[in-house]
């Protein structure tokens, strides 16, 4: 199955749909984003060039620029495992509603959840504006209230103050 995102005139993601692989095949039997886009335009009656309409293919298995395979576990659940074939990595991230498509980066960027967070240019994900200062002696977490890193506490005790187990 393939996934396509419908974008508005500002490249905001309006919806994401599933398209059968058979609708992506060209006359030689090769998958083609253009064929999938054409099918989306016909089925959804939203043509590229119409006001507020463009379709872009997105990869369900790509996150932070890394392509993952779904591997079934012995208990019947699935686990994402980094693929040895990273040529399948596509547009940095899966498209999420209210996220954006950045044509300069050819990447889908998820919605910004926290004020002040910045885009990581490698992963096209949002993150705190400064690096995590955690060390082996202290752990920090981002506070959206103070918009800064704060030392983590467990039951009112700063993590750095919690006794470490003896070797």
What are these regions (language model features)?
Residues 1-167:
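Viral virion structural and adsorption modules
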């Amino acid at each position: 199955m393939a996934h396509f995102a419908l974008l508005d005139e500002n490249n905001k993601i309006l919806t994401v749909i599933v398209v059968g692989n058979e609708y992506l095949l060209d006359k030689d039997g090769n998958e083609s984003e253009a064929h999938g886009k054409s099918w989306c335009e016909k089925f959804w009656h939203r043509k590229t060039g119409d006001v507020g309409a463009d379709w872009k293919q997105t990869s369900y298995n790509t996150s932070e620029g890394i392509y993952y395979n779904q591997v079934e576990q012995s208990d019947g659940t699935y686990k994402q495992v980094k693929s040895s074939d990273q040529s399948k990595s596509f547009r940095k991230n899966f498209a999420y509603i209210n996220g954006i498509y950045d044509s300069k980066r050819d990447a889908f960027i998820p919605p910004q959840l926290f004020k002040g967070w910045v885009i990581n240019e490698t992963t096209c994900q949002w993150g705190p504006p400064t690096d995590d200062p955690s060390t082996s002696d202290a752990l920090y977490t981002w506070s959206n209230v103070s918009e800064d890193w704060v030392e983590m506490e467990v039951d009112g005790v700063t993590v750095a103050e919690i006794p470490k187990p003896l070797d």
